[in-house]
Amino acid sequence: MVDARHATGQHGEDEAAALLQRTGHRIIARNWRHGGLELDIICETGDTIVFVEVKTRAAHGLTSPTDALTHQKRHRLIRAARAWLAAADAWDRACRFDLVCVTQRGATCTLEHITDAFDLTETLGGGDTSWQPW
């Protein structure tokens, strides 16, 4: 049995995937897991691999979906992306991290797609820190 929180999250991910497809993204994988790491949606647009985090909240919630993309969460996303790139042997591909915020109001929802949702340099501590090993 799926609890209400998981059902809400699944509905948000379904809506986000549909939005991405409508805007020309090709879905490669959903809910990709490696150990304790997970990527909600992996897709591509043009030559770029896009790792998409989906955050779903009820409209009456006290926090916005963007508040859930903490520094720690960004690090986990980067680790998961590294694992996927290694598994797919796709280190030569351009990559970015997007965020799709889903706010549910009853049976309807509002979606916001944030491209390049966070700065890798800031997340990885500044300087010339490359997250891809080349």
From Swiss-Prot:
> Which domain of life, per UniProt?
Bacteria
Instruction: State the InterPro entries in the record.
Output: Restrct_endonuc-II-like, tRNA_endonuc-like_dom_sf, UPF0102_YraN-like
**Which Pfam family, any one of them, does this sequence belong to?**
UPF0102
What are the protein's GO molecular function terms? nucleic acid binding
NCBIfam families with a match to the protein in the record: PRK12497.1-3, PRK12497.3-3, PRK14680.1, YraN family protein
Question: PANTHER family from the xrefs?
Answer: UPF0102 PROTEIN YRAN (PTHR34039:SF1)
In the record, the note on similarity to other proteins reads:
Belongs to the UPF0102 family.
Name this protein carries in UniProt? UPF0102 protein DVU_0833
